[in-house]
Amino acid sequence: MTSLTQVKQYGLYVNGEWETTAEKMEVLNKYTQQPAAEISVATKDDVNKAVASAKDALKNTFSPYERYEVLMKAADLLLSRQEEFAEILATEVGKSIRESRGEVERAATTLQISAEEAKRIHGEGVPVESAPGSENRMAFTVKVPVGVVAAITPFNVPINLVCHKLGPALAAGNSVVLKPAEVTPICALKLAELMEEAGLPKGRLQVLTGDGAEIGEWLLENQDVNMFTFTGSPRVGELIRSKAGLRKVSLELGNNSATIVHKDADLEKAASLISQKSFNNAGQVCISVQRIYVHTNIYTAFVNKLKEKTEKLVVGNPMDEQTDIGPMIRLKEAERVEEWVKEAVEEGAKIELGGKRDGAFYLPTILTNVNDDMKVCRQEVFGPAVAIAQYDEIDEVISKVNDSDYGLQAGLFTNDLQFAMKAAREIEVGGLIVNDASAYRVDHMPYGGVKKSGNGKEGPKYAIEEMTEERIIVLNL
């Protein structure tokens, strides 16, 4: 085993060098709640130095093929160290070792996709001669890097979501200043070591650790940052957008994902997928199923089937192979979910399963008899709790799904093609998943939301569009 059993110290990664600072911060093992690592806390000078280094690196040629080679080598190195990274993930996040292995594999895939996309960045010919007075002119567009990209990543998927920002940014020819979540920074720091080994040119990647609010503010103040890409809460996303000015901003924010189970659905399939995709990573995923709308005709049968599937999930030590669900990221988050569930019960909800907390663990919880004004339906739970409500009519359930501040993804189980197409047209989300839960995602698909779920798209091909500028060249011959 190579998991974090001793407190290891990590510095900042700036201009290709590792630097320690006077102030340190502990990273906890989320299962034992004991220190697993110690990280350096960046100062404003460190932030400005990192941005200057990233800007300076842009002066050096980094061809599309070189980007491809570096990213492919990094993916190979990551796969060769899958178990090491998986154990770090299980330690610093608390997700199960099996789920952690899957995340590392997906992160490598994200780097591979980014590498391939680096070779496909191109412009197009523009027929300017069709305009009067433009005879003997030719025009074409090229895609150029936006420049210095500040990437701020969340705690819940700390290797794959880092790769979703780092991979496309580098593939597009940018430099990156990465700020990982302070509670789960180790995978990002280890990834910097790996990128260096893969041959990434000096200065193309900086990793800053420490207080997110402070570092984020300093990055926003620095006008040499050309773009911000952020995954996290709507509150912080709105703050970044308000302070970024005319600079590019891409935001992947919250959601209270809905999944519909229609009367013609395959109940076995629906219950199995929803159980899995409601409680993975203790429900701490932006597209985890939170609201479930079930047709009245099959409501009781579905609730029983979902309880049956969920009861089989094993809660425990993330390092145990049998474990499905580990602790939440912080004790206070488990306490918050506990409070929201208690509040729902006081307002009339019924606990069908779970509803209990043990330290930072919160048992997978199924609530019925809910209404759309309860916090567990209206806000983002970001924990292992789902709320099930009934519906009778298609228009009614579409209206319920849309009655939300969020719009990232939704799920729909049905064999009715007309319903599926109506939902595709009318449900206000960035992605509708038919015959799977809202939490379905593969890493090359476009991923992003509407309303308070953010703007812009992830998925390497689509993120590269966000991270480049289109420039037109006109030749007067």
UniProtKB/Swiss-Prot annotation:
Keyword DNA damage: no
Description of what induces expression: Induced by growth on sulfoquinovose.
Enzyme Commission code: 1.2.1.97
Keywords annotated in UniProt: Carbohydrate metabolism, NAD, Oxidoreductase
InterPro entries reported in the protein's UniProt record: Ald_DH/histidinol_DH (IPR016161), Ald_DH_C (IPR016163), Ald_DH_N (IPR016162), Aldehyde_DH_dom (IPR015590), ALDH-related_metabolic_enz (IPR051020)
Enzyme class: oxidoreductase
Catalytic activity as recorded in UniProt: (2S)-3-sulfolactaldehyde + NAD(+) + H2O = (2S)-3-sulfolactate + NADH + 2 H(+)
Classification via Gene3D superfamilies: Aldehyde Dehydrogenase, Chain A, domain 1, Aldehyde Dehydrogenase, Chain A, domain 2
Single GO MF annotation: lactaldehyde dehydrogenase (NAD+) activity
Active-site residues, as the UniProt record annotates them: 252, 286
Keyword NAD: yes
Ligand binding (NAD(+)): 232-233, 253, 380
One Pfam family matching this protein: Aldedh
Family to which the UniProt record says this protein belongs: Belongs to the aldehyde dehydrogenase family.
Function according to Swiss-Prot or TrEMBL: Part of the sulfo-TAL (or sulfo-SFT) pathway, a D-sulfoquinovose degradation pathway that produces sulfolactate (SL). Catalyzes the oxidation of 3-sulfolactaldehyde (SLA) to sulfolactate (SL).
Protein name as annotated: 3-sulfolactaldehyde dehydrogenase
Source organism per UniProt: Priestia aryabhattai (Bacillus aryabhattai)
